[in-house]
């Protein structure tokens, strides 16, 4: 799950390998078919951790530019920031597992709750909307124009729908 999230984050700028968003379907199926809600939540958290570790690791480099006294602190932002951001994906996976009765229903709930948790991450707690899945449309200006109608979180819902589509198959 962690590796799938990390590789899927390569859809974001500057890489923009948009088809990799489909890798999110693998952890989505693990979440939907998990034996317990706890395992579903763990899979969601690991996927989110991989996504954010691969996409915000560079923030930790600010500690080591100039003064080498801060090297011991490097693991804090390198691991801590992705952990905090991934914690928003945990309730999405847990609620999807809890509310859905079938694999398809759980996938549908997961799509909805991931989009809502991304909104919450950007507005409610962290105010840190960086690296939302909707940013994958940055490489395609005509599609990016739809942000004027649906905003970043509408694009995030669309990106997640594309990522989870193979799981619905």
Protein language model regions, located:
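Membrane-embedded alpha-helical bundles of multi-pass enzymes
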Residues: 1-169
